[in-house]
Amino acid sequence: MADTQKLVLFSGSSARFGYDSAALDAALPHYEVVNMGVFAYTNALPQLELIRAQMRPGDLLLLSPEFDAAKRQFFTTNAFDDAFFCMAEADYDIVARLDLQQYSGVFSALGSYLQTRADMTARSYAVSPSDLDEDGNAVDTPSYNEYGDYVLYRPDAVDDTPIYGLPVDYTTASFPYDTYIAPANAEFDRFAADGVRVYLTYSPRNSRAVSADSTPEAVAALDAYFRENLDVVFLTPLQDSLMPGRYFYGTDNHLSTNGVTMRTAQVIDALTKQLQVEGIAP
């Protein structure tokens, strides 16, 4: 798809659990939709560099960084980790497409990955991720569609109670400029220099799975801080990403099936309006 005009969705697993890409595809007929959300707790930098090599002028990149893994999602380090090699198992040659001189810890991460892999029971490469659910259990219908969305039905939660005791901080103090904003802008600017339009919509999170300091005023201030400093076009307010916990399944940032429908409709509305403002056909 390198030569096809496309919309690439990028985040961690909240993206593969967070979009109805078929609905996006229908709303944006000029673009092929690709969901590249995999795992937030590995460095996003090498992932995005591999993605950037496949994008062309006029393509759209829609980011939705996960704040519970902010250091990795905002490129605060160039270090490799073993999880990156897990994602490369289908084609180890993709590692050679990166300029490894730009990264640290490559061989230590590889060693850690190989050690872990050696202790695991071998599985057939004929088995696709779509043959298994998120917990590794075999399923009768594909768990992923052709876009990369996780599509097994996920019911709403019975109430809004957070799943994990991990209250994420949505305050400006948690995102100092030099640590988070500067490296993020450096990567975003590489895409822009290639003619790729870069947009941001915040990743969804259970509104009760935030810190006590993350008051509505603090959330609004953080949104304003990002808008003032990040070199991207913002589609939606930060507050809109904090949703009732009933619309999540299994974690505080994986949406239920109903949550996906709601969130995708919000993104479609915001993105199509922004493209119209820019004079671009959806």
Name each model-derived stretch:
Residues 9-10, 35-38, 170-177, 187, ...:
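Second-shell loop/turn segments in exported
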Residues 213-282:
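C-terminal regions of proteins
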Residues 80-194:
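Secreted/periplasmic serine-hydrolase-like ester/acetyl group-modifying domain
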Residues 35-37, 202, 236-238:
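Residue-level recognition of beta-strand->loop/alpha-helix junctions
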Residues 1-6, 282:
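N-terminal secretory targeting modules
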Residues 10, 14-97:
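Membrane-embedded segments
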Residues 188-214:
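Active-site segments of SGNH/GDSL-like serine hydrolases
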Residues 4-6, 29-32, 56-60, 192-199, ...:
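Loop/turn elements at helix/coil->beta-strand transitions in domains of secreted/extracellular proteins
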